[in-house]
Amino acid sequence: MRAAILREYNADLNLEEVPEPGCEKDGVVLKVLACGICRSDWHGWVGEHPRVKPGQILGHEYCGEVVESGPESGWQVGDRLIAPFILACGSCPSCRSGASNNCADQRLPGFVEPGAYAEFIAVPRAHNLTRLPEGLAPVTAAGLGCRVTTAWHALTDRAALKGGEFLAIHGTGGIGLSCLILGQALGARVVVVDVVAEKLEHALGLGAEAAIDARKGDVAERIRAVTEGGAHVSVEALGIEATTNASIDCLRPLGRHVQVGMPVGHTAFQTINMSAIYLKNLALFGTRGMPAWRYPSLLGLIGAGRVDVAPLIARQVPLSAASAELRAFNGPTAPGVAVISDFAG
């Protein structure tokens, strides 16, 4: 099969012919229909993700069609499925408690095992998989493996966002736009922050109530001004110190900060404003992924027409364009996200 392989950090991925993956007894092999290109892939590509090593096939945000099914998988050839990027064991204390995204023995295609920048992907532990809803395009569904589901869990489980609350979002990449779309569906009043004017205009077009250019003045002060004293919930969607502190500082008393952006490599340790946390009685939440059992709560909204995540997709690209898309994350990016939909090109 054709795959794009990381051979050297910060260099073009190698397009190579490699053997098709084998199928585990509790898993499936999928023909990849679409795979999102995510900032988390970029962390691996530049060498800052601690588990991504040369030789890795990236790609953790995908959907596909079953071409081979293990005897214990519960799926059939021809089924079209969505996969969460965390494949939980189902039996450890975290899994038994419902927090399978904290599984002690999680498997991670795209980070540790071969991912979906390829024509086929082996997916073990198929109890984590969910059927692709009829009528949902694969390029849209791919985001349900990471960015959209991560945003959904961050807002509904970690932050417990309520209708009428102010939601601030720092960064309007894929996860930030997902939080915008989902936050609106939950009835929140959304304020977005970025440094790219085109992305701010794009977010306003998707329904943000206000858009703040982080290059122009004190971000937290300006958010407090447009949110009647501060956001109730603030999402940091980049993983860097400046936006983490802006997110904390923009909150009203008893506000909730959610760390969605991934702090790795040189951003793994950050200095944050603990005084603001103490004085305003703030709550800080970490979040990563979503337990697979929560898929119906999100897919129900999508199926009912209450949520449309298609506007996230800015462009469909061939596998050969993955390197260029990863390189684009080195600086401010254009609005929307890229999805690989052609694995022969």
Model-derived features with residue positions:
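Residues in the short beta-alpha loop(s) of Rossmann-like NAD(P)-binding domains
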Residues: 9, 196, 263, 290, ...
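Glycine-rich beta-strand-centered segment in the early N-terminal region that forms part
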Residues: 21-35, 48-93, 133-135
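Mid-domain Rossmann-like dinucleotide-binding core that forms the NAD(H)/NADP(H) cofactor-binding site
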Residues: 80, 134-217, 221
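Short glycine-centered segments of the SAM/dcSAM-binding site in methyltransferase folds
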Residues: 80, 166, 255-256, 283
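NAD(P)H dinucleotide-binding glycine-rich loop of Rossmann-like/cofactor-binding domains
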Residues: 89-170
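Glycine-rich cofactor phosphate-binding loops and adjacent beta1-alpha1 units
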Residues: 159-161, 201, 206-281, 334
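C-terminal capping/lid region of NAD(P)-dependent oxidoreductase domains
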Residues: 162, 194, 228, 258, ...
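C-terminal substrate-binding/catalytic core of Rossmann-like NAD(P)-dependent dehydrogenases/reductases
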Residues: 220, 224, 228, 265-315, ...
